[in-house]
Swiss-Prot record:
Function statement: Transcriptional activator that regulates the tissue specific expression of multiple genes, especially in pancreas and liver. Binds to the hepatocyte specific promoter element HP1. Binds to the inverted palindrome 5'-GTTAATNATTAAC-3'.
Protein name as it appears in the record: Hepatocyte nuclear factor 1-alpha-B
Bias (Polar residues): 284-295, 306-328
UniProt gene name: hnf1a-b
Residue ranges constituting the POU-specific atypical domain according to the UniProt record: 85-180
Cysteines paired by S-S bonds: none
Region annotation Dimerization: where it falls in the sequence: 1-31
Motif Nuclear localization signal location, chain numbering: 195-203
Ranges that cross the membrane: none
Location relative to the cell: Nucleus
Family assignment from sequence similarity: Belongs to the HNF1 homeobox family.
């Protein structure tokens, strides 16, 4: 039997059982339908209300309404609801009928009547705002009374019940005279002085929403014919919910379902679904970016990070942070500078010609290169930096298979280079060495040839040499040509780890101008290191770089060593006469 009852009927039956009526009493009342005539008598029929013989009082009803302490309010005892004054404008028969029904409801259990009123509002999709506008009750007080059974004064309950009775008559007339005016004579706007009634907004009922959700799962963009079929189905469900015939659908009034409303519902549902999807994706992407930050310790073995280039104005801020965010979406395959065994810390570069990496070299024992050894991870923001030195160039002189080496990078521009302090976990860059004057291009050619021949000894250095060409990666940029004739050795940066930091920080800078005489001649195209003083190391050109003298003088910053050079002979040595041998053996240092 329960399956044949509607949702509203099940709620009413449950309310009867909760009110104290037992199943046996309910069955007996249904069997004795003639004696219990009140539920079967329409509220607009006043024939049996005046007699009072056929009206059965509920067991927990109140014989004489009494106002409790909780029912006291600021309105006072002489509060008269506006709707009660409107009863005087009705005909004597209608006024007597409505007053009799209201008095009868006042004798019922307030909580039970409140449930009936709430069920009626839900059945006909009537908002509580309409009750508030008509009766003058407080919105919060009315909601608490209908939902929680909060006590309400007798005068206010009489106003609520008067509206309830009048609304029943109004809706009954709407379905009886479908297609006519939806406002009755006794409840018209003109009958309520100084009160502007608002038209009720359309509200989807639960029956119609269930039909539309099922249709949305089948087809998110229904055609006009499908929407019209849904209109008929929804109106039919709304009429059955109200207990009237589907042929009286025009009596739904403002709750009548139309094709335009169905179209708007599908459009709004699609927008809501798209918004929920976007919100879920944004939340997921935010969690992914916060849960997986890229750092030197998080980089997997065998992966090569790539870096992006910022503007020159942002280079200082990026270097101050010592690391910049690595954006996978902005990476370019042409920026892969290291092999699979190398790892770098990403640091943003400038908008200059090709930006290479200044990185420490691997030790001879590659098997000891693990993820925990992060001392050989570094990248510097230098334009056209060239890393010199390979595993084969280290030679057998380094018996300690450490993974840290001393690297000197050669820049192609005479400009201020930001210095990174404390990059990674144990690496530090020192002050860059500035050359105030550039070598003439005619001097550069022999040196470039020697460096290129040296770097071609291994695949890594060959790749570095190829990437150093400003036309290899930046052929589409017109401003590359202005950097091709720049000096080759204008700047040098020294990289080391914390084990060698104490030695290098003890060096103090000084300046000395060494003249290049045009009458000097030599056969070896290189430079020789001399130790003029036991505490000063400087570069002195003992051989001419080219037959044509074009450079008159150059300046070099020298570093004074506070300790004896014998203790740190692995840093610089005056025993090499050519730049080739100097590059291959002396531009690297193993951490002790």
């Amino acid at each position: 039997m329960a399956s044949q009852l509607s949702y509203l009927q099940q709620e009413l039956l449950r309310a009867l059982l909760e009110s104290g009526v037992t199943k046996e009493a309910l069955k007996k009342a249904l069997a004795d339908g003639d004696n219990y005539a009140y539920p079967n008598v329409p509220l607009d029929d006043i024939r049996n209300l005046d007699e009072g013989d056929n009206c059965v009082q509920l067991p927990n009803g109140l014989g004489e309404p009494q106002m409790s302490e909780d029912e006291s309010s600021d309105d006072g005892g002489d509060f008269t609801p506006p709707i009660m004054k409107e009863l005087e404008r009705l005909s004597p028969e209608e006024a007597a009928h409505q007053k009799a029904v209201v008095e009868r409801l006042l004798q019922e259990d307030p909580w039970h009547v409140a449930k009936l009123v709430k069920s009626y509002l839900q059945q006909h999709n009537i908002p509580q705002r309409e009750v508030v506008d008509t009766t003058g009750l407080n919105q919060s007080h009315l909601s608490q009374h209908l939902n929680k059974g909060t006590p309400m004064k007798t005068q206010k309950r009489a106003a609520l019940y008067a509206w309830y009775v009048g609304k029943q008559r109004e809706i009954a007339r709407q379905f009886t005279h479908a297609g006519h005016s939806m406002i009755t004579d006794d409840m018209s706007c003109d009958d309520v002085p100084n009160k502007k009634m608002r038209r009720n907004r359309f509200k989807w009922g639960p029956a119609s929403q269930q039909i539309l959700f099922q249709a949305y799962e089948r087809q998110k963009n229904p055609s006009k014919e499908e929407r019209e079929a849904l209109v008929e189905e929804c109106n039919r469900a709304e009429c059955l919910q109200r207990g009237v015939s589907p042929s009286q659908a025009q009596g739904l009034g403002s709750n009548l379902v139309t094709e335009v409303r169905v179209y708007n519902w599908f459009a709004n549902s699609g927008k809501e679904e798209a918004f929920r999807h976007k919100l879920a994706m944004d939340t997921y992407n935010g969690q992914q970016s916060s849960a997986q930050p890229l750092s030197t310790h998080d980089l997997p073995h065998g992966k090569t990070p790539r870096y992006t280039q910022d503007s020159s104005t942002d280079r200082s801020a990026a270097m101050a942070n010592s690391q910049s965010t690595l954006s996978p979406s902005a990476l370019e395959p042409s920026h892969i500078l290291m092999n699979s065994d190398s790892k770098m810390v990403p640091v943003s570069g400038g908008s200059l010609p090709p930006v290479s990496t200044l990185t420490a070299l691997h030790s001879l024992d590659h098997s000891q290169h693990t993820l925990g050894q992060t001392q050989n991870l570094i990248m510097a923001s230098l334009p056209s930096v060239m890393t010199i030195g390979t595993d084969s160039a280290l030679g057998p002189a380094f018996s300690n298979p450490g993974s840290s080496t001393l690297v000197i990078g050669l820049a192609s521009q005479t400009q201020s280079v930001p210095v990174i302090n404390s990059v990674g976990s144990s690496l530090t860059t020192l002050q860059s060495v500035q050359f105030s004057q550039q070598l003439h291009p005619s001097h550069q050619q022999p040196i470039v040839q020697q460096v290129q021949s040296h770097m071609a000894q291994s695949p890594f250095m060959a790749t570095m040499a190829q990437l150093q060409s400003p036309h290899a990666l930046y052929s589409h940029k017109p401003e590359v040509a202005q950097y091709t004739s720049a000096g080759f050795f204008p700047q040098t940066m020294v990289i080391t780890d914390t084990s060698n930091l104490g030695t290098l920080t003890s060096l103090t800078p000084s300046k000395q101008v060494v003249s290049h005489h045009p009458t000097a001649h030599g056969d070896s195209p290189g430079s020789q290191l001399h130790n003029q003083d036991s505490s000063i190391l400087h570069l002195h050109p003992s051989h001419r770089l080219s037959p044509i003298p074009t450079v008159s003088s150059a300046s070099l910053i020298h570093y004074h060593n506070s300790s004896s050079p014998e203790n740190h002979s692995h840093l610089l040595s005056p025993s090499h006469n050519t730049i080739d041998s100097f590059i291959s053996t002396q531009m690297a240092s193993s951490s002790q």
